[in-house]
Amino acid sequence: KIEQLDLEFSNGERRTYERLKSRGLGAVIIAALPDDDHILLVREYACGIHGYELGLPKGRLEADEDRLAGANRELQEECGFAARDLREIGRLTLAPGYMTHATHVILARDLYPSRLPGDEPETLDVIRWPLDRLTELVQREDCTEGRTIAALYMARDLAKLQR
């Protein structure tokens, strides 16, 4: 939905802006650490680039679902794991100059096997990637999504601090 904002700034200047208003409650992207040295990635089809992309599990929040519960649900649907330890470590916007959408970065630890049915059209490949090889990962042609790249470095740096 396109929303119009008529604003007056502190200097008296008036402007009209248009922005894309998010339809939902936002989204989560999950940095799931099976141990202190690895992170879980999924390989899934991305229709925008008409190809497969390596990235972190992610998805939209459902109605009446808090961020941590939504992250745990997405983790189970996409990776076949749930987490006993979940916490929000940041918030990312895609284009704050014209979109209201935000993605919340969730760190997931203390993982255990648990699968929920998801909405993906095919089973996703789950890859354990070493945190000390992130530079190699983001130089690949199949790991280009900005939210994933930002969340990977946030999780790696936080994991280093907590050792």
Regions found by a protein language model. Give the residues of each.
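Acidic, metal-coordinating catalytic segment for phosphate/diphosphate chemistry
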Residues: 1-29, 34-35
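Active-site-adjacent beta-strand/loop module that shapes the phosphate/pyrophosphate-binding cleft
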Residues: 6-11, 95-114, 127
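Short loop segments at secondary-structure junctions
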Residues: 10-11, 34-36, 45, 109-113, ...
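Conserved Nudix-box catalytic region and its N-terminal flanking loop in Nudix hydrolases
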Residues: 20, 29-73, 77, 90
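Nudix hydrolase/Nudix homology domain
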Residues: 52, 97-99, 113, 121-163
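Helix N-cap/coil-helix junction residues
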Residues: 80-81, 143
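A short coil-to-beta-strand element that immediately follows conserved catalytic motifs
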Residues: 82-89
